[in-house]
């Protein structure tokens, strides 16, 4: 691995340690399984359907979103820097008979090899785990074809997000392992939009993602105080 790679080895180690439980619907990754249908439908709707489209999933982990997009007929490539999560992703896809590709590399490395190749690029809950999120946005702008869509989800940085994602989710409700998140690495919507625009992408839409404890489900909403998703487009010209 390039020593200059945009990778935090401590962050990688967190997910390596629990990768074997990635597809355990009641384990540490239960929130990802619960939130996936909401994300998948949003991405599908905004993309005008996924069938036949070339999609790159950056920071794919164990393949929850990657595999679900492939099931909808997309040609999916998932990339991640975690060896163990990718091993889990490959095995699960093989067991389920789902065709897609997984590669161990950074977005920047992939961009140097395959520019302008993807109709859709997704990057879910990954930017808050890398040292230089703006570098990832620049790589994404290179990877997506002109006119293509980009979907990014991350966590806002404010006291409410700290209370809900760290105190609440990690310590009180124990929805995710302690130490999963670092509040300093959270990204405000304004910061994310600026990064995207600096990379040459245009903001198309934004939505909050909210957990409803009574129904134990996630839903979309206008409030972007905590979890949120942004849709970008790469302009056809310029």
Curated annotation (Swiss-Prot):
CDD domains: AdoMet_MTases. S-adenosyl-L-methionine binds at residues 39, 59, 80, 124. Disulfide bonds: none annotated. GO terms for biological process: methylation. Pfam families: Methyltransf_23. The keyword Methyltransferase applies. It is an enzyme of class 2 (transferase). It catalyses: a 3-demethylubiquinol + S-adenosyl-L-methionine = a ubiquinol + S-adenosyl-L-homocysteine + H(+); a 3-(all-trans-polyprenyl)benzene-1,2-diol + S-adenosyl-L-methionine = a 2-methoxy-6-(all-trans-polyprenyl)phenol + S-adenosyl-L-homocysteine + H(+). The keyword S-adenosyl-L-methionine applies. Pathway: Cofactor biosynthesis; ubiquinone biosynthesis. GO terms for molecular function: 2-polyprenyl-6-hydroxyphenol methylase activity; 3-demethylubiquinol 3-O-methyltransferase activity; polyprenyldihydroxybenzoate methyltransferase activity. Keywords: Methyltransferase, S-adenosyl-L-methionine, Transferase, Ubiquinone biosynthesis. Signal peptide: none annotated. It comes from the Bacteria. Its EC number is 2.1.1.222, 2.1.1.64. Transmembrane segments: none annotated. O-methyltransferase that catalyzes the 2 O-methylation steps in the ubiquinone biosynthetic pathway. HAMAP family: UbiG (MF_00472). Belongs to the methyltransferase superfamily. UbiG/COQ3 family. This is Ubiquinone biosynthesis O-methyltransferase. It comes from Aeromonas salmonicida (strain A449).
């Amino acid at each position: 691995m390039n020593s200059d790679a945009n990778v935090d080895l401590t962050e990688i180690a967190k997910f390596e340690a629990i990768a074997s439980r990635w597809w355990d619907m009641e384990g540490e990754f239960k929130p990802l399984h619960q939130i996936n249908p909401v994300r998948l439908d949003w991405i599908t709707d905004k993309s005008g359907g996924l069938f036949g489209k070339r999609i790159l999933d950056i920071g794919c982990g164990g393949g929850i979103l990657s595999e679900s997009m492939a099931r909808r007929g997309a040609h999916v490539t998932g990339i991640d820097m975690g060896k163990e999560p990718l091993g889990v992703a490959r095995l699960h896809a093989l067991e389920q008979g789902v065709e897609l590709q997984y590669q161990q590399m950074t977005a920047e490395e992939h961009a140097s090899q395959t520019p302008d190749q993807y109709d859709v690029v997704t990057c879910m809950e990954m930017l808050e785990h890398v040292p230089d999120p703006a570098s990832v946005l620049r790589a994404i702008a290179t990877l997506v074809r002109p006119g293509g869509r980009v979907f990014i989800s991350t966590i806002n940085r404010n006291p409410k997000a700290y209370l809900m994602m760290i105190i609440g989710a990690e310590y009180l409700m124990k929805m995710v392992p302690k130490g999963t998140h670092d509040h300093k690495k959270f990204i405000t919507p304004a910061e994310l939009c600026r990064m995207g625009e600096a990379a040459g992408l245009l903001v198309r839409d934004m939505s909050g993602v909210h957990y409803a404890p009574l129904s134990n489900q996630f839903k979309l909403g206008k409030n972007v105080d905590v979890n949120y998703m942004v849709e970008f487009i790469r302009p056809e010209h310029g």
